[in-house]
């Protein structure tokens, strides 16, 4: 009888502990690398195209033939208020914010905030859901990123595809963030 009472108290203690346990929200990340996972790219970083300001999935983010350079990112969490993904060059200079440009087959690029309005791009709505980069399209979280072939081996352009439309790339990709230590 005493063991049943003890067991009941133990379960009650465990149940109350679970009920009052505070969940820790997943925070954003700073100084993170965005890596891409897809059919032809596993853990390839996203690089910046110095010629056009667009983002590329590259086996080598410093690919000089494609004129690419690596970036680090400051990324908000979906529980945060500022859903903007800001990029920084390796030398510490701000590159700008991630944007989607409808006029360029929904290419994804980086520009300073002041210039994004002139190219009619979408800059807000990018955040992390756990470690995956998503886009908030009117309260729907979407991850519709695609890789598009380029003329360089091991380099794909990063694009966005709207719901119910023909994909604007060769294969879908998932983008995940990892913080550098």
Question: Which sequence ranges carry the predicted segments?
Answer:
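Low-complexity intrinsically disordered segments
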Residues: 96-118
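Aromatic-enriched hydrophobic runs in primary sequence
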Residues: 3, 95-97, 126-127, 145
């Amino acid at each position: 009888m005493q063991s049943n009472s003890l067991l009941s108290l133990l379960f009650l203690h465990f149940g109350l502990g679970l009920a009052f346990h505070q969940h820790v929200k997943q925070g954003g990340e700073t100084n993170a690398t965005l890596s891409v996972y897809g059919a032809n790219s596993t853990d390839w970083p996203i690089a910046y195209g110095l010629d056009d300001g667009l983002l590329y999935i590259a086996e080598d983010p410093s690919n000089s033939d494609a004129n690419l350079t690596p970036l680090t990112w400051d990324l908000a969490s979906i529980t945060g208020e500022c859903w903007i993904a800001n990029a920084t060059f390796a030398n510490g200079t701000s590159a700008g914010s991630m944007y989607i440009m409808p006029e360029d087959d929904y290419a994804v690029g980086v520009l300073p905030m002041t210039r994004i309005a002139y190219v009619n791009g979408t800059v807000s709505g990018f955040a992390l859901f756990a470690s995956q980069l998503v886009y908030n399209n009117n309260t729907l979280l979407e991850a519709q990123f695609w890789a598009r072939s380029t003329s360089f081996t091991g380099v794909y352009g990063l694009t966005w595809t709207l719901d119910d439309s023909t994909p604007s790339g060769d294969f879908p990709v998932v983008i995940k963030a990892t913080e550098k230590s």
